[in-house]
Amino acid sequence: MKKIFVAAVIILFAAAYAVGNYFVDFALERGEDLSPPKACANIADPTLKPPPVPNFPAEDWSLESFDGLKLHAKKFSPAEKNNRWAILVHGYGRDGTYAYDYAEEYLKRGWNVLVPDLRAAGRSEGKFITMGALESRDVFDWAKKISAENPDAKIILHGVSMGAATVLMTAALEPKNLCAVVEDCGYTSAYEMFSAQLKKIFGLPEYPVMPCANIVCKIKTGVKISDAAPLEVVDKIKVPVLFIHGDEDKLVPFEMLDKLFDKATAPKEKFVVEGAGHADAKRKNPAAYFDKVFNFLEGCS
């Protein structure tokens, strides 16, 4: 009887690991030839291509992450030298090239721009995406590098989707010279977001998939999916935050906007783009989008 019980427990744990491992490999593991995770095929718009490279002087930057990964970023310089810096952070399954249209707008207005490839994306090393849990530490290090290069820098963080979650968590770490944050369609937590979308997007039930995936993610990456939780730290941010969300977002539920906004204690503004889906606020109305962003950032000039 005891042997049967032990065997049953082993089978149960093996099954739980297999379930969690399937999700982590499907949703978080980088594909072959630097491609995004397999799950991106279920989420990403296949017609969306990287915008043109901004027509401004550019150079490659690199740094080593706290856990030994070589990370890459593209640094663009405006026409006139100044102390204003924008770190633009891409979303899930993308790389820094997808932020080049945002970079163009900042550069035209005289900002220095740094566009990182987050870990496990683009030219940066890494096997797994962690939905902002570790990426936020990497962006913190990019901000630290900027401050070392330019001690008088005024740095803003602007992120979209997973990039938005990342910049919120980065801001809570209080990088030196941080001036403001723009978050566009960020989630309260990756765990909550995946749970809400699991059946619709991946055809999987929340239970037992998410609890098992949380454990396997911890084993494989050192952090849990639930560690990517901006809602838990947004009240620690001390600089002004602009919260942006499209009211037709089907991926990151629209109600997450108010949860984040209400929890924030720093000076804050909210910008809802009617009719915009996920990560589509800028494309829906570019003029209104960037007018709002740069009016908000006037205090960092």
Residue ranges, per PLM feature:
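Short beta-strand/loop motif that positions the catalytic acidic residue
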Residues: K236-K238, F243-H245, D249
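Catalytic histidine neighborhood in serine/cysteine hydrolases
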Residues: D262-A279
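Hydrolase active-site cap/lid region
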Residues: M169-V223
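Conserved alpha/beta-hydrolase
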Residues: E105-E125
